[in-house]
Amino acid sequence: MVNDKARRSVIQFEDVSFEYSGAETDSIHHISLDVKEGEFLVLTGGSGCGKTTLTRLVNGLGEQFYEGTLKGRITLLGRNISEYPLYEIGKKVGSIFQDPKSQFFASITEDEISFGCENYGVPYEELDRRVSSAIKRINGDMLRGKEIYPISSGEKQKIAVASVNAVDPEIYVFDEPSANLDMYSVEALKNLMGGLKAEGHTIIVAEHRLYYLTDLADRFLYMENGSIKEEWTAGELRSIPEEKRRAIGIRAADLHHIEVDISPVKEKDMTMEVKDLAFSYRKHPVFHDVSFQAYAGDLIAIVGHNGIGKTTLSNILCGMQKEKEGQIIYNGTKVSKCKRKNFAYFVMQNTDCQLFGDSVEEELLLNGKGSTQEQRDDLLKLYGLFEWKERHPATLSGGQKQRLTLAVSDWIDTPVLILDEPTSGLDFKNMMRISEHLKALAQKGKTILIITHDYEFAAMTCNRVLHFVDEGHVETFPLQENLSRLYSCLMCQ
């Protein structure tokens, strides 16, 4: 590796603080940072610690798009970043956001990938080459020519990465890039990042999941309350004692040291039975002959590759979509689509679709009429949201929004609770908080189904696995003594 002193600085923060309009305190404060050309930097820390704000300042959005006050100086490639027009920063700094839909402009995958190049006037022949190369990098041949809306969240994330890759900026900024990806796709993302690093690109990643970055990152910066508190190499990160890692709330650096943290549930009353379920989208089969049973107290991890139909199955179970064939039986009775909402509640992956209040507390009031102030406060404290009770949900971080939707689900007393990627955007502390709460609900007899790609979370939370092997075939197995099988299921998707 070239000595840092011999490499030019591409990004410099000099005593930088930033406060969003309406906020009582700075989101980040007194940050001083020097990022060298070709460096791979990872920002980690608890939800709301300032990681996303720091990335917004690197790509120019913090000062030029979001309302707020910036103090200090940010230098990008030798110039004060405030001197650049935003479109010029976009050529130099490519951004992949936590919610990929927020950066889409086209309805077809290849149109989206080419959109940035077209805006910068890239000649057609070169544009076609870049688009093909970007699709190859994300292993996305199956996504060519597809409409963006119906593809899965993980596939949307891939398209976002490809669209930035086609522009070929010098600096890449990723905000929680693995949040919606299965483990196989995370490996593909890792390889993509490794290729970018080998080409000399500077890469900044804000991330909770760290295991896939330890072979790539030059530095890990741990943030807390808007400040950089610690800095580690990959070796130092792996050497952090388990007690300290849990205390500061960071994810595992090595998945092979994770153990099952839940006992098998003794078979109780059957809550739900699915028989020969089939579904098609625009005459294209999504799955068929899906059958399984779920019991009171079950915590079932639903796994399978992106786009195989896990979310569609959940939509059908709670009455938001109708199956083509098959039966869904709750408590021994076949239930029609319109009545399923009384039996199953679905916490969606896209939390914005379920948040309607003008404040965090009002969100609870909309769903918990008749609740007392003490009950609402206790629930917000349980999910670590009490100090944000007056904040508008739109101003929360991704992890905070996720916890709010879970808090709302507590008011809805259905025998079955279904969650779609509940740990997306969560740090270790909040992942543990969610895990312990779901286990407490299961102990009370609730049946819980969790769509997840998160091996660490599934190992500490679930007792059974429902694996979509391929379209039309599922298998179930107990997680106890089958942890390696779960790992294989997630890695071979």
Specify the residue positions occupied by each region the protein language model found.
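The feature captures the beta-strand-to-loop junction immediately N-terminal to the Walker
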Residues: 44-46, 303-305
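Helix-to-loop junction immediately C-terminal to a conserved catalytic motif
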Residues: 59, 318
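Conserved ABC transporter NBD signature motif
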Residues: 67-79, 326-340
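Conserved ABC ATPase "signature" region
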Residues: 125-143, 373-388
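Conserved ABC ATPase signature
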Residues: 147-151, 155, 392-396
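Catalytic Walker B motif of ABC-type/P-loop ATPase nucleotide-binding domains
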Residues: 172-175, 417-420
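H-loop/switch region of ABC-family ATPase nucleotide-binding domains
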Residues: 207-208, 452-453
